[in-house]
């Protein structure tokens, strides 16, 4: 049986990048959106603008997560780690689709900065993979913990009547917590404090800019 080469994985990464960044009319998912059967809520123009900003940030975060997983899968050493990264990336596609659909419903669109975040995250993921699978998994765990924390903050910022967005974020939060737990069980090591702070600083830059652009 032929094993995939680095070139094969690189071609797959280019394909994944195009699938992530080129917005389809409707993205194919493996799961139904948590908001699918919920009724629309009457929102003011200001509320729509604010919710759109939050969902644009969440969508950008999922673009980063997708890229991080793809970069790590590109350089991971162990087969089961590569498979775990690919599985997590597939779930992030669902998140992308849910965020995109909600943005369109609100009359908005994803961040124009997504290509920048994607490229940076792929590079970070690939470097983490080169540093070793345990460190790579540590990046996954820490990334997912930070994503979970900002999703929790967004849940507090949303109007209580916006049941659709709340349902989406809660399901995403559950998935991210599961990804972090799975990474730790697979042998992730805790990252140094300075690395965590650097990741947090980059995350803040992404969230503050993607909210508006």
UniProtKB/Swiss-Prot annotation:
SUPFAM superfamilies the record matches: Ferritin-like
Cellular localization per UniProt: Cell membrane
Cofactor: Fe cation
Enzyme class: oxidoreductase
Binding site for Fe cation 2: 92, 144, 176, 179
Binding site for Fe cation 1: 62, 92, 95, 176
Major subcellular site: membrane
BP GO terms, sorted: ubiquinone biosynthetic process
Name of the protein described by the UniProt record: 3-demethoxyubiquinol 3-hydroxylase
């Amino acid at each position: 049986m032929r094993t995939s080469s680095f070139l094969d994985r690189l071609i797959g990464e280019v394909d994944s990048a195009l699938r992530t960044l080129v917005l389809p009319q409707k993205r194919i998912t493996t799961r139904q959106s948590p908001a699918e059967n919920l009724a629309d809520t009457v929102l003011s123009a200001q509320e729509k603008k604010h919710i759109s900003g939050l969902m644009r940030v969440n969508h950008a975060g999922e673009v980063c997560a997708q890229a991080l997983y793809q970069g790590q899968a590109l350089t991971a050493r162990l087969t089961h780690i590569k498979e775990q990264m690919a599985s997590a990336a597939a779930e992030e596609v669902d998140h992308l689709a849910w965020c995109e659909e909600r943005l369109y419903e609100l009359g908005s669109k994803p961040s124009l900065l997504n290509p920048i975040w994607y490229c940076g995250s792929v590079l970070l993921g690939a470097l983490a993979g080169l540093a070793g699978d345990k460190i790579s998994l540590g990046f996954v765990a820490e990334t997912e913990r930070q994503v979970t924390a900002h999703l929790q903050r967004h849940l507090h910022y949303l109007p209580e009547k916006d049941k659709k967005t709340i349902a989406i974020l809660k399901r995403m939060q559950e998935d991210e917590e599961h990804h972090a737990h799975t990474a730790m069980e697979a042998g992730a090591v805790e990252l140094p404090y300075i690395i965590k702070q650097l990741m947090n600083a980059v995350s803040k830059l992404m969230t503050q800019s993607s909210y508006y652009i």
